[in-house]
Amino acid sequence: MQTVTLLAFLVFLFTYALISVRRVRSVSIERPAAALFGALLMVLLGVVTADQVVEAIDLDIIGLLLGMMIIVSCLEITGLFDRVASTMVDRCGDRFTLLWVSMGITALLSALILNDTVVLMFTPIIVKVCRSIDANPIPYLVGEALAANIGSVATGVGNPQNAYILIQSGIPFTEFAIALTPLAVMSLLVAVAIVALVFRKDLFDEGLRPHPIDRSLLAAASPKVRLEFPFFLVLGVLIAVFIGFLASSWLGMPVSLIAFLGGCFLLLALPLVKKDTGTGPILRGVDWTLILFFVGLFILLKGVETSGLMALMLGSFEDMGAGVAGVAGLTVVSSVLSNLISNVPAVMLLSPMIPVGDDTLWLSLATSSTLAGNATILGAAANVIVVEKGLSMGAEVRFLDFLKAGLPVTLVTLLMSVLLLGL
């Protein structure tokens, strides 16, 4: 092994260890800081040159994420999530209905916009609604986290790792959605059933009849929201962006450019029609830490590639192909890595090992890295957000509370994924 390859290997191991443990003694190390430090070491040790740093950063992925984040920030400012809560309230007459409606809405929104943002906005609403009807919020919070991850599987913009896979694989947005939406729908049904079974005492009486709830109490917890022109402007742009995604092949424009143009338009237009909103609040709604995390990983993995380390790693996967065996093998590796180092770095590490043009394995990587995150609280960022937000409002989701629903959901949905994509 050459010196540069050995250096790249040591930096790679050190950085991924930091990303995994997120702590050095008593000092907390956030994932973006760990990734950027690894990138810095690659440059300082001469593994990556200055020119290669610029070359490593994939502007397509950054543009897609940034554009969608700006649009979501504008939706939040104009009251989308309050309106969704009001709609949810109107449809619920018992606790089980509240569960499947809240999970369904969470999954749908997570397919359209980044799932982390959905749970960030939706968790306080769920806790507030549960408190108003004297219901245990734990089943609803666990269901929300599972639904957010499952719903995000359906499209290339539901979560960061899917956005990365969408760009790297070259799979058209429409084909991506058509291939994975059925799996997402079936997985959601499985999740609703398992959550209802695990938490049946909170949802049903002894005769297995759903506990009724007083809609007037729900209405008080989530009053009607008046929608004004700024909301419809943002919603119109979101719809236009998704139409652009569907027609991206015909338009000859990458989805990243479509999302970025939509975000830029709203960044300028929304402050003009909503006088109490400037560009500052919109930009504060962007997850800049995720952008920096991607930048650091891009440079780190460029070092892995240029040093020859990637070629050594790829040798172990030369015989991986489609079919049940190939999909199952990738699913196991991806699932384990996603729970050890989180799904985004796992996907970026495994993606060079996918044979060129093998859409089945790309889709398998998307499903396994996302669905595996449902196993434990730490398996996905959305889970952590739900748990931390709930805890801040006095609703504690314990590790076992999550595990007893999340683990069976993960095992069943991963098996469904292997069968659906492998056969």
Regions found by a protein language model. Name each.
Residues 110-120, 137-174, 179, 191-196, ...:
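Alpha-helical transmembrane segments and, especially, the helix-loop junctions at the ends
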